[in-house]
Amino acid sequence: MSKRESSKYKIDRRMGENIWGRPKSPVNRREYGPGQHGQRRKSKLSDFGVQLRAKQKLKGYYGDIREKQFRAIFAEASRRKGDTPENLVGLLESRLDAIVYRAKFVPTVFAARQFVNHGHVKVNGVRVNIGSYRCKPGDVIEVKEKSKQLVTVLEAVQLAERDVPDYIEADHNKMVATFVRVPALSDVPYPVVMEPHLVVEFYSR
């Protein structure tokens, strides 16, 4: 198992949920946590614990974003007009690594970040190697010509178990995607329930 896969499944085990809907997730095989004490009855979480868990799950889903960076994203969501939970999700889904993942150019969000960081992606014809780069509606994201034959890309396109959401248009023959619009929370195909309103409560304590 690769280090990237190990990190991904570690998050699943920590959350006790298959947060990416992956068939190989260890939580599909058991309903309790890892380790010798995993089968003990879970204690009821406090309000703080529920809020913390919601934050960890949302952070984890997008590749275990570092706390400092995630807090900065939340701060921007709070400053923007409109509903803060909706703004938060919109900002997360506007990340370049998230769009590369949603477009099914790679199998996981972890792979998407690495793929971008290694310089395999262009935005509007310009190479961008920052996973957190924020895309705007109308931006065209494409896999570099020399990168289209990478095994990771080919397997993702051929074996993907996810549908491309309607706020992204993807051409898998050309490996080009367009970020059509910033989605609402209800548009995002999370395999599990995400509760960004609890993230707002956590940071508003």
Curated annotation (Swiss-Prot):
SMART domains: Ribosomal_S4, S4. It comes from Rhizobium meliloti (strain 1021). Residues 1-46 are annotated as: Disordered. GO terms for molecular function: rRNA binding; structural constituent of ribosome. One of the primary rRNA binding proteins, it binds directly to 16S rRNA where it nucleates assembly of the body of the 30S subunit. The keyword Membrane does not apply. SUPFAM superfamilies: Alpha-L RNA-binding motif. GO terms for biological process: ribosomal small subunit biogenesis; translation. This is Small ribosomal subunit protein uS4.
